[in-house]
């Protein structure tokens, strides 16, 4: 079934590209690559990436366009690759100042969730956990809740880690909630 979907998508894309000029074709091809990178299994997404050897260009070619890119004063970079909104992983890819891979870290872990504390800003949380899978605003409370689906293990396996921000944009608490499955 998944293979059929890929074949149909590729056929549709090739038909759409037949009447395009080069610039339109390049944009369409890039969008198609971004789509396939977004649905690519993690094992293929990360295959063959070697710290100290793999270049930033090779990473971008294999993993696609990052959700966020942060440049640091020492010349290094961090690329954010969330596998959501319903994915269970977010990868932070660190590039050294020479443009080589230095580390890949899956950040949706209990250890990282434990680092979230009252008073943190939205940017500080985003730097640590990446893009949330869901954002809910509750104007009457007032609060904004960011949620990440993750593999927590235990009885339910998957759960949501939630960060609650007050009207000042700062964390005031965290919580967890179950993933509700169909009945």
Regions found by a protein language model. Give the residues of each.
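Bacterial N-terminal signal peptides that target proteins for export
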Residues: 1-7
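A cross-family detector of function-defining hotspots
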Residues: 25-40, 45-98, 120-183
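Conserved short-loop catalytic and cofactor-binding motifs
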Residues: 46-47, 110-113
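Bacterial signal peptide processing site
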Residues: 21-23
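Well-structured core secondary-structure elements of compact alpha/beta domains
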Residues: 103-108, 145
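C-terminal motif of bacterial Sec signal peptides marking the signal peptidase cleavage site
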Residues: 16-19
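A short, polar/proline- and glycine-enriched secondary-structure boundary/capping micro-motif
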Residues: 105, 112-117, 182-183
């Amino acid at each position: 079934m998944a293979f059929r979907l890929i074949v149909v998508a590729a056929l549709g894309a090739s038909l759409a590209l037949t009447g395009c000029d080069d610039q339109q074709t390049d944009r369409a091809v890039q969008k198609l690559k971004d789509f396939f990178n977004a649905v690519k299994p993690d094992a293929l997404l990360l295959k063959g990436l070697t710290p100290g050897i793999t270049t930033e260009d090779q990473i971008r070619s294999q993993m696609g366009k990052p959700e966020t890119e942060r440049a640091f004063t020492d010349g290094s970079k961090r690329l954010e690759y969330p596998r959501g909104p319903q994915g269970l992983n977010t990868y932070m890819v660190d590039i050294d100042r020479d443009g080589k891979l230095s580390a890949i870290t899956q950040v949706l872990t209990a250890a990282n969730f434990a680092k979230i504390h009252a008073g943190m800003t939205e940017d500080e949380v985003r730097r640590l956990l990446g893009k949330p899978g869901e954002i809910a605003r509750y104007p009457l409370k007032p609060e904004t809740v960011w949620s990440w689906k993750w593999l927590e293990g235990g009885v339910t396996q998957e759960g949501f880690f939630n960060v609650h921000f007050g009207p000042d944009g700062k964390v005031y608490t965290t919580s967890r909630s179950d993933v509700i499955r169909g009945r």
